[in-house]
Amino acid sequence: MFTQLKRGRTAAMVFLAGMTVSASAEAQQDDRLSIHGSATIAYGKSDRLPVTGITKDGTSDYQILALQFGYKISDKDRVVTQLLHRKIGSSPLNAVTPAIDPVWAFYEHRFDNGLTVKAGRNPLPRGIFNEIRYIGTLLPLFRVGNAVYGETLEFVDGVVLRKPFDLGSDWSIDATLFGGGYDLKAQIPTSTGVSVVNTRNENTVGGQLWVNTPIDGVRVGAFANNYMSTPSATLPEAQRPNRTTTFLYSAEAVFSKAFARAEYTTFKQTKSPNFVDFSSYYVQAGVNPTEQLTLVAEYNDGRNMVRFANTPIPNLALPLNQDVALGVSYKPSAQVAFKLEGHRVEGYQFDTPVPSVIVPTAPPLVARLAPAQRTYYGLLSVAFSF
């Protein structure tokens, strides 16, 4: 099984490389064809527990490769396809991650009034980083805002409409609406261990609004999405989940020598047996002492409510991981970045089950948390793009 999986990953990388060479030759003959690629290759090692695919043994099987093809049909029309190969060390999420994932495949038309319409498999307009989080040269860390972005929600299959509005006095807004469906993959700690979620949400409608302030680089945003979990219609009515709404709030200030960002997300499903009550956030700040050097600190946190169905035991807030990260990035050019980062992780969201909830067996019937686990890990990576 391991050999077959390794061969599949190797074949995927060879396939992407072959497509790049072939497409590059064609691009030289047709200036309407554009090709962009990015890769981030890393080595990680933890001191105790496995986390985000990084083990005590260390792993170099840690990479993100993205290859994007665009074709300009006219001045107002284009098509874009992006292929993604991702390997996250020994993470349980590898089991639900394809070797090659066509994360984007859309047609785009721009109207004279500034309205843009995309149809197909579109980038999901969600938060600060969602549309660029696999381009390592644009990120201060290997991954950013892991508590909010995770390893999912890259796309929406459907339609996306975007339009900017000038409000005057240097204020403006960017408004986006979308509808369709998308995959949801996540790794969530529960009272009994680690749960890998791999579901499909359909009949979703949502939008995002960015407010750009007169201060250059400062903006605030909000994202909302109402969706139906599947299966639904094929289930007995009493078992069908309610529609769920998820929210994301963002704030960003980026200047020439410093930056600060924060995002918070939450969603809730109150109907049994699909009870979910989840929230998480991150804050990030950094400085750029020189054009090539970036120093960054980031804190991620969140919680998942544990419900003890059919018992008098009250719900319990199960913390996720409190992740404190410090990193340094050196960019000799805009296309290359070398990064070194260290993380202190404390909580219950690891790649192997850890004791989390102590269920009461006698009065008082109040559950309590087991002692939180802690581990440290480091990542050394190189990112390049073209």
Cite the ranges covered by each PLM segment.
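Bacterial N-terminal signal peptides that target proteins for export
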Residues: 2-12
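Signature for the C-terminal beta-barrel architecture of outer-membrane proteins
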Residues: 30-34, 88, 111-117, 152-295, ...
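Outer-membrane beta-barrel biogenesis signature
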Residues: 14-58, 230, 332-336, 383
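Outer-membrane beta-barrel pore domains
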Residues: 50-55, 94, 105-110, 130-134, ...
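Soluble or luminal CAZymes and related metallo-dependent hydrolases
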Residues: 61, 99, 153, 201, ...
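Outer membrane beta-barrel
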Residues: 29-35, 42, 56-184, 210-216, ...
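Short, small-residue-rich loop/turn micro-motifs
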Residues: 39-45, 83-85, 123, 226, ...
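Small-residue packing motifs within transmembrane alpha-helices
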Residues: 13-14, 217
